Amino acid sequence: MKIVVPGGNGFIGSHICRLAVNAGHEVVAFGRSGEPDLLPVRHPWVGKVTWRTADVFDVDAWSDALDGADAVIHTIGTITQDPDNGVTFDRINGEAAMVAAEAAADAGVDAFVKLSVQSKPPGVSGRFLASMRRAEREIPARLPSLRTVFVQPNLVFGDDRFGTPTMAGVLQSIGRLVPFEYGSYHGRPLPVQLVAATAVQAATTATLRGALGVDQIDGIGRTSGLVEIDDLPEPTLRPLLAGIGSAALTYWTLKRLRRTSA
């Protein structure tokens, strides 16, 4: 099958591309920065992907990639806004997906898979989730020819992103003490490999459609045959967190814990 991946050079997108080409699919990926900064010697799959430099809103720059394509896996999204530079929840999480879906439908593509989220992340505006859900309602309603699937994990972690497994561990640990969606079993963090495998399965399996939450992603990813289950990373509580985002999220969870305990 031929799969087109908008945002394929990102964290989850690159894992999707890797699993898809290793499974024998033809993959074309594009993003504003083009090919990911990965050494082909260490990541031989990179050379099997056709990389394009394009903005999703400039359809003329990438629509030819849809020729003969069977599926689109849309991985573009944001949890922060920068309105001065055109980065808003509605534009990036909603309009970008609609643009890609319309182009896919016009090209006769069968399936449109969109990465989304099951619940609102801690400390993030409710407009983030609202923009996701709006796109998930409008795409199947306006483009019924597409088989649409929305892959909805919560926190996604992987060994190749330092600090992310730590944050997953913090949320999982806090969730045992103070119940909230991201720390519960049904809202648990998932390894990026399972999310990527589910996205590939969603693109290539005609019976999959609609929203796939954390439990379904876990099950589909583990039975996909695309990942080595024994090699999956586990979220851990490490002493050092990386990045301002992780520190801010940790501060938020600890404040929540103190308020609940008071």
Label every PLM stretch briefly:
Residues 26, 33-34, 78, 83-137, ...:
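Conserved Rossmann-fold NAD(P)-dependent oxidoreductase catalytic core, especially the SDR/UDP-sugar
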Residues 92, 96-97, 163, 183-202:
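Substrate-positioning beta->alpha
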Residues 3-25:
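N-terminal Rossmann NAD(P)H-binding glycine-rich loop of SDR-like oxidoreductase domains
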Residues 175, 189-229:
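Alpha-helical substrate-binding/gating segment
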Residues 149-170, 176-178:
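Flexible, glycine-rich beta-alpha linker
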Residues 30-35, 56:
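N-terminal Rossmann-fold cofactor-binding loop
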Residues 39, 43-99, 103-106:
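NAD(P)H-binding glycine-rich loop region in Rossmannoid oxidoreductase-like domains
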Residues 233-258:
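Hydrophobic alpha-helical topogenic segments used for membrane insertion/localization
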